């Protein structure tokens, strides 16, 4: 399957172009897709984008089987409307994949379906690397900040991952502190909470005061949980 990756940034809160490319490439590799072109846009995507030569070359090429986006929110109009606009200049159907959302759009009648998504494994690998870096005395704030941007796009994106993987992250933190992988952490709840708080408090250095409360909320929720360490 030949595909084109489409990345776009509409605000400072969006993941960086480079992060979107990395995630999309990883997804394409996981699904054995051949990337033949990459399109970078600034702003959301709508029918007007299709008027540019870059898009015309892709849309009118029936050898292209699919477009791979980072997420659905890149498109400011209905996905079905965008699809119909593209099909006016094609003889062969084209699919759209949305990596972060683990969704695919297969055309008319408009229908989304879930796809196999391995981005979580990618994120977990990078979080392990981040925890190692944060435990190294030789890594300064600049190095860690650049690592976060290069691998997660933004601190907001990283926080979203942390929020959905609290139990796993505490397990990794515990392991990095040398406590082993088969400890029932609920028996050492205060120690676990302290380790988690220390981790997110370090991340506060990379957040503005406006966004720091999100980290506090994570710690509050953590305090309410009974956690069993898992591999």
Curated annotation (Swiss-Prot):
Sequence similarity? Belongs to the orthopoxvirus OPG058 family.
List the GO cellular component terms: host cell nucleolus
- The name of this protein is Protein OPG061
Keyword rRNA processing set for record: no
Q: Which domain of life is it from?
A: Viruses
Chief site of localization: host cell
List locations, semicolon-separated: Host nucleus, Host nucleolus
Species of the source: Vaccinia virus (strain Western Reserve) (VACV)
**Record's note on what induces expression:** Expressed in the early phase of the viral replicative cycle.
Q: Which InterPro entries match?
A: Poxvirus_F16
Cystine connections? none
Q: Which UniProt keywords apply?
A: Early protein, Host nucleus
Q: Which gene encodes it?
A: OPG061
Carries keyword Manganese? Answer: no
């Amino acid at each position: 399957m030949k595909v084109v990756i489409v990345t776009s940034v509409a605000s400072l809160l969006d993941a960086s172009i480079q992060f979107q490319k990395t995630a999309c490439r990883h997804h394409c590799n996981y699904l054995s897709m051949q990337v033949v072109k990459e399109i970078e846009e600034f702003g959301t995507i709508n029918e007007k984008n299709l008027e540019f030569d870059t898009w015309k070359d892709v849309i009118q090429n029936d050898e292209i089987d699919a477009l791979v986006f980072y997420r659905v929110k890149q498109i400011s109009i209905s996905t079905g409307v965008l699809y119909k606009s593209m099909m006016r200049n094609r003889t062969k159907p084209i699919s759209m994949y949305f990596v972060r959302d683990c969704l695919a759009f297969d055309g008319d009648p408009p229908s989304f379906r879930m796809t196999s998504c391995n981005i979580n494994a990618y994120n977990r690998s990078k979080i392990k690397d981040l925890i190692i870096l944060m435990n190294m005395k030789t890594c300064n704030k600049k190095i860690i900040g650049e690592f976060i941007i290069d691998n997660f796009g933004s601190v907001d994106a990283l926080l979203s991952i942390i929020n959905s993987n609290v139990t796993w992250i505490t397990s990794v933190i515990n392991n990095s502190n040398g406590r082993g992988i088969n400890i029932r952490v609920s028996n050492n709840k205060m120690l676990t909470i302290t380790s988690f708080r220390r981790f997110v408090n370090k991340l506060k250095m990379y957040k503005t005061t406006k966004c720091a409360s999100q980290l506090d909320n994570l710690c509050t929720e953590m305090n309410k949980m009974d956690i069993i360490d898992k591999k």
